[in-house]
C-alpha cells in the first residue's frame, strides 16, 4: 500500500546535522512526519492472520455498527444495491426502529404521543423524501425525525421569549436545531425546523399531545412562574458528544435520556467541572489519533510492519476532562499557553487537549536506513452555530510547535498545513527533531553502559523526558466569501487567524516490561463571567408593591450642613480643647428657610443660630471646612490660622484649583460658592478620581509644600481689634465699586457671586450676617491684619 510520506521531511544518512552526534551518526534514524494512513485504513486490505506481532490486536477506530438480523429472508440478488425489495426492507427496518424508539424506549420517561400513530402522520412519513439537505441526505429522514420529536420534548414551548445561554439569546427553534445536531451530528437550520413544525401542525392541529408540545398552555403563559427553558440535565454543551467516528458510520445513535416532564421547580443549567463552556461558533475535538514508530529498511512504511513502536494511541483512549488548574505547574511547563490565556487582545476561545505520552525507547540503534514515522490526526467537529464556517471551509491552516525543557524553549517551528477536505486535520510533529533526539539518547546510553553507569544513564533519560513538554497551536482563517456573509468589516478580528485547537504534550519513559501508550483528555479553563449563567433561586419571591409615601418615609433625611469627620482636629495643635458645636437637624418645614425672600438659594442663613453667643463654641467655618485632611501634616509655621486668646479659631481656606463639570456647587476662591459650569470638581476627570472621597483624600504634602502651588498663607496673628466687644453678630458691609477693602491676594474672574445670584440677593445674603466680634474678623471694624501681610499671589 502506498503511503503519503512528505519527501521534504526525509533525513539522509549523511546529513550534516547528524554528523556531530557521534560515531554512530551513520546509523541515525531517517524520519518522516505525519500524513501516513492510519492503521485502521490498511487493516481491512491486508491479511493479519498468523501474525505474532501485538499490533494485530489493534482495534478499529471506525467500527461499523452491527447489521440487524431481519425476521424474514432477504433477497439473494445482491448485485444490484438498489433492488426494490432491498430498499423496501431497509425502509421497514428504519421504520420499525423509529417506532420502537418512540414507543417502549420512552414509555417510562415521557408522556404518550398519540399523534405518532395517527393516520395522517403515518401517511406523511410514508411519502418518499424528495428534498435533501446540504449533506446529501433527506432533510427529515427517520433518524432526524426521531431526534426532532425528542427535541420537542426537551424544549417546551416558550412563545416569543428567549433562552439566555453563554451570553446569547436562543429561540425555541434554535434550541431544537442545536439539540438535533448534538444528537445526530447532522445540522438543520432554524428555518428548516420552523417549516417542519408548520407542515406537521397543518394535519396534527387539535391533537392534545401535539398541542402540548407546540403551544404554550394558557395557565402557564399568564401565571407568574419561572421562565421556561430547555429540559436538559445540563447546559447545551454538556450533551454527551459522539464517539470518535460515530457521525461517519453509526446509522442510529442511542437515544437520549430525557428529563421528567415540565415542573415549575426546574433549575437552570449551571456550570460544572465537566463542562466545556465553549461558544457555539467554536470547534470541538471529537477524536484524536497518534502513533510513533520505526520502519525497518525495505519494509512498507506502515505501523503494522514497524521495527519498533515508541508509542501509540490505541482505539480511543480518552480520559475524563480535567480542570486546567489541576495540572501541576502548567504555567511553568507550558509558557505559550500561559501567555495566550493572559492575552486580552486575543482571548483563548478554543479547546485545550492534553496528551500524555509514554515512550518505549530502543536498547540499540536501528538498522541502517531505518525511518521514523509519526502520525498525528485530529478530528475537529464543526461549530454548532449555523452561521459559522465548517472545518473544510476554513483556509490558511497553520501549526506552531514549541518544545520546552524545564520551561525553557529549546525548539520552535511553523508549518503550513494542507486544507482539509473533511473534519480531519493532520499537523506534523517535528519528526526531524525527534529522530535527532532519539539518536542522541541512544548514543549517550551506549557510552554510559560502556563505562558501567547503566543506571545513571537510565535515570538521566527519565529526568530528561520528565522535564520535556511541548505545545502545538493550530490556526485557520475564515474565507473572504463567508466573511462577507457574516457582515465583518475590513480589519475586523475575523480576518485574523482563529485558534482551532491547542495541544499540550507531556512525556515519560516507560518502565521495564511496559509498552508505550498515549492517552488524551480535554482541559477545562475557568469560565468567563460573561459566558456563565447566573444562578437563580428555586422559588420565586413576590414582594408587595411599595407606595410613594412609604418610599419617601423610608429614605433617610440628609443634612445639608453636616460636619465632616474629625472637624475639630485642626484646632488641637494650636488651641485648647473645645466643645464642638452640634448642628441642628433641619426639619421638613425648615426647607423653606433655605431660600431667600427673593427666591434665591440662601447658603448662609440655613444654619439655625443659637440665641446665646459663641464664646464657647467652635467657629462655623471650622465646622464647614471642606478640606479637613490638609491639617494632618505638621509644620513649623502655623501660618494661616489666626488664634485669639479666648475666642474660637477661624481657618482661612487657601486657593485650590477645582476641576470642571461637576453638577453641583463647590468652594472656589475666597470661599465663594461657584456654579456647576465653572471651577467645580469632576467626578471622572483625568486624575484617576472616581469619587469625592478621592478628591478629599488625606494629603501627603505639608502646608509649606502647598504654599508653592497655591496662594501663600499669612503670618501668624494673635490679636484682633475689637474681639472682646459685644456678644452679638455684626453685619459685614457690602463693598461697592466706589468702596473697596484691601485684600492681599489677586482677584480672579468669575470667583464671586456674580452670575450666580442677582445683586439684590447678594445684599440680602451678606447683610444677613451679624456683627459679632466672635466671628474672628467678620465684623464691620474687623479687617484681618493677616491679609495685609502679603500683597502678591504666587503664580500657579
Swiss-Prot record:
Keyword list, A-Z: Activator, Conidiation, DNA-binding, Nucleus, Sporulation, Transcription, Transcription regulation
DNA-binding region: 133-207
Signal peptide from the UniProt entry: none
Pfam families to which the protein is assigned, alphabetical: TEA
Description of what induces expression: Expression is induced during conidiation, after conidiophore vesicles, metullae, and phialides had formed. Negatively regulated by velC. In the promoter, a 45-base-pair region encompassing the major and minor abaA transcription initiation sites contains directly repeated sequences related to the mammalian initiator (Inr) element and is sufficient for correct transcription initiation and for developmental induction.
Leucine-zipper-like as annotated region, ranges: 341-362
PROSITE patterns xref list: TEA_1, TEA_2
Gene Ontology MF: a single term: DNA-binding transcription factor activity, RNA polymerase II-specific
Any one biological process term the GO annotation gives: positive regulation of conidium formation
An example Gene Ontology CC term for this record: transcription regulator complex
Keyword Nucleus: yes
Compositional bias per record (Polar residues), positions renumbered to this chain: 243-252, 629-643
Segments of this protein annotated with the region Disordered: 215-254, 612-643
Location (main, coarse): nucleus
Disruption phenotype: Prevents the formation of normal conidiophores. Fails to form any viable conidia, even though it does produce morphologically normal phialides.
Location in or out of the cell: Nucleus
Known function: BrlA, abaA and wetA are pivotal regulators of conidiophore development and conidium maturation. They act individually and together to regulate their own expression and that of numerous other sporulation-specific gene. Controls temporal and spatial specificity in Aspergillus development. Directs the differentiation of phialides and is continuously required for maintenance of their function. Expression of abaA leads to activation of brlA and wetA, cessation of vegetative growth, and accentuated cellular vacuolization.
PANTHER family: PROTEIN SCALLOPED, TRANSCRIPTIONAL ENHANCER FACTOR TEF RELATED
Family: Belongs to the TEC1 family.
Protein name per the record: Conidiophore development regulator abaA
Organism: Emericella nidulans (strain FGSC A4 / ATCC 38163 / CBS 112.46 / NRRL 194 / M139)
Taxon lineage: Eukaryota, Fungi, Dikarya, Ascomycota, Pezizomycotina
Gene this protein is translated from: abaA
